Amino acid sequence: MSKQVNVNFHQTFKPECQYISSILDIADGITWRSVKDISAVTGIPQGTSSGKVEPHISYAEYMGLVKSEKQIKLSRTDLGKIIYMEDPGLQELLTKTLLHAMILRQENGADMWSDIFNSIFPKYRNGIKKELLILELNQLYANKVTTKN
């Protein structure tokens, strides 16, 4: 891996069901939107330093719910269509568990989360300190891991 990887890739906030649900709601596969448009339509905050639109689109992609193209056209995946019909607000425990599993996939999931949960945590069943986690990640990511926000 050539680029530096930030342990805080999630921008120090967790995925919010209401925001992912809003992204799923507008993912029609037809409309091209800017980040500003998506923020206006969904109510997802998009300030200069506190933008949550793009990270939540990434979360939705990692969860296998949407596909996005760079000028931002969102379309629901087959899984996204089912979840949108059955649990559009992403409130059911089964939905949340499934989305957690999807984000941890080794292919198309969030790489670092996948590595943490699938490769590192199983070696430390009694817990792991942050310093050791960073050390393990640096071994996986060729010393490119940082904890800077």
What spans do the regions from the language model cover?
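Donor-sugar nucleotide-binding helix/loop cap in glycosyltransferases
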Residues: 1-149
